[in-house]
Regions:
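Short, conserved charged micro-motifs
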Residues: 12-18, 60-68, 111, 153-157
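Short amphipathic alpha-helices in soluble, non-transmembrane regions
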Residues: 19-23, 64-75, 117-124, 157
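Intrinsically disordered, low-complexity segments enriched in Gly and acidic/Ser/Thr residues
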Residues: 112, 116-139
């Protein structure tokens, strides 16, 4: 049974691969299937719009689809993601997202010379301790965007 997991996540390919690898390991260990592919879909600006992961389950049963849904919710993927197969679709996901856009060109040179984005990440993750963390980022011409996902958007902001 072939399924498409449409992730409501702005993951760079390398970060999507991390999720694919974790899923593959669990699917292999349980004998329930395998990850067969994936992709990252971008907006015209180059910023990631969403991601997809292709999954093949060994047995085409409602029980296995529910098992996969529960697994994805336990692992933690963004809300409004979906599992799609044969014209069917179910919503999956438990995490809420927050994007932080850092201006990369309009501030004074001093700001860029003295400020480290890694410090910003560290401080934001520290403030979100136990609620959320950074999953990915994107560097555009004008902005660097940090993508955080966690249990509550309200508490993360």
């Amino acid at each position: 049974m072939e399924l498409l997991l449409k992730l409501n996540a702005k993951f760079q390919p390398v970060h999507r691969f991390e999720l694919e690898d974790a899923l593959q390991e669990i699917l292999e260990q349980t004998g329930k299937g395998e990850v067969t592919g994936g992709g990252t879909i971008q907006n015209p600006s180059g910023e990631v719009a969403y991601c997809e992961i292709e999954i093949s389950l060994t047995d085409a049963t409602e029980e296995n689809v529910n098992w996969l849904k529960n697994l994805l919710n336990k692992i933690g993927i963004p809300k409004k993601s979906s599992l799609n197969w044969n014209g069917n679709s179910i919503e999956v996901g438990t995490l809420e997202g927050l994007a932080y856009y850092s201006n990369g060109q309009d501030l004074s040179e001093e700001v860029y010379a003295t400020c480290d984005i890694n410090y910003v990440i560290q401080q934001m993750e520290s403030a979100m301790d136990g609620i959320g963390r950074m999953y990915s980022y994107w560097e555009g011409q004008k902005y660097t965007v940090l993508y955080f996902y966690g249990t509550s958007f309200i508490e993360m902001k």
